[in-house]
């Protein structure tokens, strides 16, 4: 089983897809990694040689911020926005959409479930 960046890649999947299990690596970045390291994207993870796994591991380690470091960086960026009190920071603090979406009717995912307001119904 190939273990890269602390993640066990699924054995039966193609390497191209298996790399996307690592936080911070999507399908395009996965293709770029495989192209640069010279590994065939159609190879199954279980069929990778130890040398290929090490090549991929080294390339990712040198060129990308992934997993815990990326999560920490994102959390610190959000914390900084909240602390300086900018518009985006205020939106994060209030749990509202940050990127300019309308909130009158939508944004349920970000705002959470509806809360009932007592005394509103007409009798």
UniProtKB/Swiss-Prot annotation:
Residues 95-123 are annotated as: Disordered. It comes from the Bacteria. GO terms for cellular component: cytosol; small ribosomal subunit. Keywords: Ribonucleoprotein, Ribosomal protein, RNA-binding, rRNA-binding, tRNA-binding. InterPro entries: Rbsml_uS13_C (IPR027437), Ribosomal_uS13 (IPR001892), Ribosomal_uS13-like_H2TH (IPR010979), Ribosomal_uS13_bac-type (IPR019980), Ribosomal_uS13_CS (IPR018269). Pfam families: Ribosomal_S13. One of its GO terms (molecular function) is rRNA binding. One of its GO terms (biological process) is translation. Belongs to the universal ribosomal protein uS13 family. Located at the top of the head of the 30S subunit, it contacts several helices of the 16S rRNA. In the 70S ribosome it contacts the 23S rRNA (bridge B1a) and protein L5 of the 50S subunit (bridge B1b), connecting the 2 subunits; these bridges are implicated in subunit movement. Contacts the tRNAs in the A and P-sites. Part of the 30S ribosomal subunit. Forms a loose heterodimer with protein S19. Forms two bridges to the 50S subunit in the 70S ribosome. This is Small ribosomal subunit protein uS13. The gene is rpsM.
């Amino acid at each position: 089983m190939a273990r890269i960046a602390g993640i066990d890649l699924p054995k039966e999947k193609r390497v191209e897809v298996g790399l996307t299990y690592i936080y911070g690596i999507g399908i395009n970045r996965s293709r770029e990694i495989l192209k640069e390291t010279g590994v065939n994207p159609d190879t199954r993870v279980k069929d990778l040689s130890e040398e290929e796994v090490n090549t991929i591991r080294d390339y990712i380690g040198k060129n990308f911020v992934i997993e815990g470091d990326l999560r920490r960086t994102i959390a610190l960026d959000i914390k900084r926005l909240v602390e300086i009190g900018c518009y985006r920071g205020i939106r994060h603090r209030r749990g509202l959409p940050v990127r300019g979406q309308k909130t009158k009717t939508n944004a349920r995912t970000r705002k959470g479930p509806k809360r009932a307001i007592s005394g509103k119904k007409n009798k």
